[in-house]
Amino acid sequence: MASTPNSVTLYTDGACSMNPGPGGYGAVILYGDGRREELSAGYKMTTNNRMEIMGAIAALSHLQEPSQVLLYTDSRYMVDAMSKGWAKKWKANGWQRNAKEKAKNPDLWETMLTLCEKHQVTFQWVKAHAGNKENERCDRLAVAAYQNNPNLVDEGFGKF
């Protein structure tokens, strides 16, 4: 990973009404210089896990320069896949989890792995709905994104 003096803290969350169903993600970007940005988007049909990953991808993609990133998420799936090397292993095995089961969401994991080559990312789990101000904000952004007539199409939904 590239070394960088830029320090960024990200909070991300995904939400889905039904699963699958309409979904959204929310992200809060806190830059080391004190700036703050919020991102969100809603999709017509997706899953909660896809929204969790897409929220992180959107936030990481938004960063203009290679950065040292601390990414907080309430998705153990994402934290474990990245921190324990599962996503890299799935990719090395042709997107297979094991001999019988394909890895889910390979399109998103591929993008996440590429972004983690650009940025130094540490994934940190945070308990959902436990009073963490920024995680709660991301949840509100994600829910609002799917409740407000989402019109985006998750191109990878149902393809893998």
From Swiss-Prot:
Cofactor comment text? Binds 1 Mg(2+) ion per subunit. May bind a second metal ion at a regulatory site, or after substrate binding.
What cofactor is this protein dependent on?
Answer: Mg(2+)
Keywords recorded for this protein, A-Z: Cytoplasm, Endonuclease, Hydrolase, Magnesium, Metal-binding, Nuclease
Q: What is its EC number?
A: 3.1.26.4
Q: Where in the cell is it found?
A: Cytoplasm
- Keyword Calcium on this protein? no
* Entries under InterPro entries matching the protein: RNase_H, RNaseH-like_sf, RNaseH_domain, RNaseH_sf, RNaseHI
| A single GO molecular function term of this UniProt record | magnesium ion binding
Q: Which Gene3D superfamilies match?
A: Ribonuclease H-like superfamily/Ribonuclease H (3.30.420.10)
Its cellular-component GO annotations read: cytoplasm
- Broad class of where this protein is predominantly found: cytoplasm
**Residue positions binding Mg(2+) 2:** 13, 139
Q: Which residue spans adopt a coiled-coil conformation according to this UniProt entry? A: none
- Which Gene Ontology BP annotations are present? DNA replication, removal of RNA primer
Q: Where is the RNase H type-1 domain?
A: 4-147
Q: Which residues bind Mg(2+) 1?
A: 13, 52, 74
* Enzymatic reactions: Endonucleolytic cleavage to 5'-phosphomonoester
Q: What is its EC class?
A: hydrolase
Q: What does this gene product do?
A: Endonuclease that specifically degrades the RNA of RNA-DNA hybrids.
What do we know about how this protein assembles, alone or with others?
A: Monomer.
Family classification: Belongs to the RNase H family.
Q: What is this protein called?
A: Ribonuclease HI
> Which source organism does the UniProt entry give?
Synechocystis sp. (strain ATCC 27184 / PCC 6803 / Kazusa)
Q: Which gene encodes it?
A: rnhA
